Curated annotation (Swiss-Prot):
This is Protein nucleotidyltransferase YdiU. It catalyses: L-seryl-[protein] + ATP = 3-O-(5'-adenylyl)-L-seryl-[protein] + diphosphate; L-threonyl-[protein] + ATP = 3-O-(5'-adenylyl)-L-threonyl-[protein] + diphosphate; L-tyrosyl-[protein] + ATP = O-(5'-adenylyl)-L-tyrosyl-[protein] + diphosphate; L-histidyl-[protein] + UTP = N(tele)-(5'-uridylyl)-L-histidyl-[protein] + diphosphate. The keyword Manganese applies. ATP binds at residues 91, 93-94, 114, 126-127, 177, 184, 263. The active site is at 253 (proton acceptor). Belongs to the SELO family. Mg(2+) binds at residues 254, 263. It is an enzyme of class 2 (transferase). Keywords: ATP-binding, Magnesium, Manganese, Metal-binding, Nucleotide-binding, Nucleotidyltransferase, Transferase. InterPro entries: SelO (IPR003846).
Amino acid sequence: MDAEIISVMPFDNSYARLDKKFYQRINPTPVKHPRIILVNRELAGEMEFPLPETDAELAELFSGNKPPQGSEPLAQVYAGHQFGNFVPQLGDGRAVLLGEFVSSSGKRYDIQLKGAGQTMYSRNGDGRSPLGPVIREYIVSEAMFRLGIPTTRALAMVCSGEEVFREQALPGAVFTRVASSHIRIGTFEYFASRNDYEGVKTLADYAIDRHYPHLKEAGNPYAAFLGKVCSVQARLIAKWMRIGFIHGVMNTDNTTISGETIDYGPCAFMDGYDPATVFSSIDHYGRYAYARQPSIAQWNLAGLAGCLLPLIHKDTGQAKSRAEEIVQGFGPEFRTHYFAEMCSKIGLKPEEPVQELLNDLLQIMHESKADFTLSFRMLGKAVLGNETPLLKLFNERDKIREWLEKWDEERERQNIKKEDAVRTMDRNNPAFIPRNHRVEQAISAAVENDDFEPTKKLIKILHHPYDDQPEYDEYMQPPEPTERVYQTFCGT
């Protein structure tokens, strides 16, 4: 594609038109020898994002060496509660937002480069990213999209040709992330903590206009905005729980206003079912354990509510009362979504008797530390008569046989055909997830041997997570004891 076409990309950088206190204007720091590794051509097509023709041009574009014409690179400022402790200034310490790309239908996409160099928010960091975390985010964010989970997306991965130094020298990389925006609860906290409620109002008006313009007609747009963010987060966390996803670092700076999953640093997927599962090496007290994710999301939303109080009502007492009522609504809404998601995993309608069935199944799984993903996937086969793959996952097989009988009674009560129940199960129980050991194997091959074939193969398999792919059966399997990943690291 020639330079003239590339130069007229339809950027409309609305965030850059906000006051300068919201960001630092800064260009990506060039890298020496960029090499394109992956380009998500399917996503580029959906966005109508024009790609250069040669690998060299792609590498220059997605490394940040030659930002597209029309972009206005900047680093966003935000604060955040990290593991419950407030940090008054964080911000994009290694990321640069190129701008907002707008498709012909008017859909707006943030395009951000991670690992693009130092900014004023780098806090003594080098602004770069090692290759490993870039591979992890590419694999997992695209898998999450295919699994039906709201998420940021991966557009490209570039090796920088430079080393970055952590505990050791590692190959560097730049990741291109696409999001509907990068506005976080922590963005609101930055201004509220400085008593800059003019900034909070500007940000709230901007977020409403960008994400939820219909709320401008509400009687109290700011209360409605808080309610909407609570709703999208309730839906998101319920979907995480359905697939056994553990984010690992649910700080307020990693909680989006849009309801998209963002920042895949120490994330992981549950192997053996245990609601207390934690993977992140820095989560010493299990704050962000699998089962705690809903309550942490609500805690984060209470932080957003605190920022919005002066906008919700001029009387502090009335503002608190209204905000509390909205945030308290998160619990029931989450439970409704979670129950529906989990019922779909066993092919039944979300009716009251199913609650006990679900509780019993999870208890049996917990007792056996049965693999979360495989147990649910094999339920469908067991229901149709092939119980062996399911029974192999459990220590006490009589319990699971007894459970299957109860399930069948409830199915009959709901008047659902077995085949229909199994179809529902297979649409909601993935055969393939980015298993932690497979992701680590892909990273090791790339970092140690410059071999990206395992990464590409894993991405290909995860493109169809709900389909049987017999030729890749080994990718369905839980890790062997020697392969098991017990801790994950942010790594950036």
